[in-house]
Every structure is written in C-alpha cells, then in structure tokens.
C-alpha cells in the first residue's frame, strides 16, 4: 500500500479521566480491542457521531500505533482516548447510576429498546467479546438482529462495524426525542 503523503508532528496529550464529566455524554468503552484498524475505525466513528471520549481497557491496542492513527483519518486529534482499569471504571459508573449498555448475542433487540442519550456503550474483543468481569457491570444487554430475522449465516459482526450500527441507533433515537 502507498503511504499517505502527509506528515503531522503532534504532542501526545496526557489526559485525565474525569468520570463525573463524562456522565453527561455518550461514551464508548472498549474491552480489549486488539486490532489497530478496528480501534482507529472506532475512534473515527466516535468523531462522526459526536462522541468525544473513548475509554479503553489497558489491554486495548495503543491509540498512537501508526495503523490506528492512520485509520482515524485525523479523528485522533478530536476524540479523547483514555486507558484505565475498565472493570473498576464500569463498576464505579454502575454504582453512580450511569446506564451501561453492552453488545451481546443474547441481548434485547437494539431497534426495539429505548436508549438513553447519555451513558456508556461497551464493545468487546474481536474474538472473545466482552470479558465476564466487564459484562457483570452492564445494565442493559443489546443485540443487533440479522435481516431477515431467521437468517443466521454469519455468526457475528466485526467490532468496528457493530460499533457503527450501535452509535447510529443511539444518535437516531436521541434526535427523535425517544
């Protein structure tokens, strides 16, 4: 592949995670997302859907990996990416009453579920999904149904693709006033 003919020299920001501030917005949480292309695409999706913060487990790919930076197409400069003990963060947010949504194969149909305009959307690892420790903090399990409903040819969606679908539905409902 031909590399981009652009170069940027930027200081890597040191960001402090402020959970109380994030409670007023929609936040993406990533549980051990390993593929740099997926992480970059998710950061780009966050930017597209007006999500300013992505909270990652410590085992998630490095957001400043060159493949991640390239996949963000500049969104890495606008979206704040935080790394922390994700299980502890989710447990504290659950205790604070923050809605925590997670994507699972056995959740509620996302298109038939009323979604909050604020809260945390938890997305899991490419191969294992959401870890049991993080899944225990989820307050609402969501499922993206296949179409038609009886079609089950594909086992699951790529994490970045699923994130795009979930973000679109959250924003659709928020703009519709649901």
Tell what function each PLM region has:
Residues 1-4, 95-99, 158:
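Short, surface-exposed amphipathic charged segments that create phosphate/polyanion-binding patches used
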Residues 8, 48, 63-74, 132, ...:
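Structured adenosyl-cofactor binding patch, chiefly the S-adenosyl-L-methionine
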Residues 14-107:
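RNA substrate-binding interface of SAM-dependent RNA methyltransferases
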Residues 17, 110, 157:
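Short clusters of hydrophobic/aromatic residues that line enzyme substrate/ligand-binding pockets
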Residues 39-42, 76, 126-131, 162:
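Gly/Ser/Thr-rich beta-alpha loop segments that engage phosphate groups in nucleotides
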């Amino acid at each position: 592949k031909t590399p981009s003919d652009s170069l940027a020299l930027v200081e890597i920001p040191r960001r402090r995670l402020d959970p109380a501030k994030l409670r007023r917005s929609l936040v993406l949480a990533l549980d051990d997302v390993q593929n740099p292309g997926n992480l970059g695409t998710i950061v780009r999706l966050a930017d597209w859907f007006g999500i300013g913060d992505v909270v990652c487990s410590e085992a998630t790919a490095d957001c400043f990996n060159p493949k991640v930076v390239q996949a963000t197409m500049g969104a890495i400069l606008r979206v704040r990416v935080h790394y922390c003990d994700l299980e502890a963060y989710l447990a504290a947010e659950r205790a604070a009453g923050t809605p925590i949504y997670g994507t699972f194969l056995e959740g509620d149909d996302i298109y038939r579920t009323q979604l909050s305009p604020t809260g945390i959307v938890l997305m899991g690892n490419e191969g294992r999904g959401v870890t049991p420790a993080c899944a225990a903090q989820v307050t609402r399990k969501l499922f993206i149904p296949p179409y038609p409903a009886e079609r089950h040819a594909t086992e699951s969606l790529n994490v970045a693709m699923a994130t795009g679908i979930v973000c679109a539905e959250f924003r659709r409902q928020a703009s519709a006033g649901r």
